[in-house]
């Protein structure tokens, strides 16, 4: 499968390593190759602030689990859905969503309530990564990236770190999924 479906030795070796680390079946491997995981994860030009906000080696581990772009081809018309409809579709397809994120993710909840002061806020999707020992907040936007979205995500990360994270957990990671981005604005 690897020899037939991969373009070069480096890609072949990367998928081999992923199979060993994640225990992928041949079906999962075939899906990951077809979705271009190598190009989206290993070679992607990712827009994150992990290197400036997180200590090594945690920043490198957090960077490794990110992809650009995420592929939600298992959801019909994903690009045309409103946020709540996209959220509904992702929750219905949670197994495939976890497969897209990678190994080690556990689903904690949708519209996860978190109390900050006297107010209650709702995180679109909350996960826990058992390999990285950290919470993983997903904020969904069905429009182009706007700077205020990063502020809201940062607020959620601080709230989760303050309310849910245990002393043995690593800092919370956030993923802001937008319809698109102006790379300069997003950075």
Please provide the spans of the model-predicted regions.
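Basic, low-complexity intrinsically disordered segments
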Residues: 1-187
């Amino acid at each position: 499968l690897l020899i037939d479906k991969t373009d070069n030795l480096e890609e072949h070796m990367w998928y081999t390593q992923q199979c060993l680390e994640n225990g992928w079946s041949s079906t999962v491997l075939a899906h990951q190759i077809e979705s271009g995981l190598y190009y989206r994860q290993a070679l992607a030009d990712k827009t994150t602030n992990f290197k400036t906000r997180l200590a090594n080696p945690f920043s490198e581990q957090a960077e490794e689990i990110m992809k650009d772009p995420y592929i939600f081809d298992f959801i019909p018309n994903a690009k045309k859905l409103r946020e709540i409809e996209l959220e509904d579709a992702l929750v219905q397809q949670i197994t495939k969503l976890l497969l897209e994120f990678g190994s080690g993710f556990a689903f904690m909840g949708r519209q996860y309530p978190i109390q900050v002061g006297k107010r209650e806020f709702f995180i679109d999707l909350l996960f826990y990564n058992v390999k990285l020992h950290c919470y993983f907040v997903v904020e969904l936007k069905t429009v182009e990236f706007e700077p205020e979205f990063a502020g809201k995500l940062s607020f959620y990360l601080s709230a989760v770190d303050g309310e849910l994270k245990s002393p043995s957990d690593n800092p919370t990671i956030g993923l802001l999924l937008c319809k698109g981005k102006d790379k300069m604005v997003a950075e």
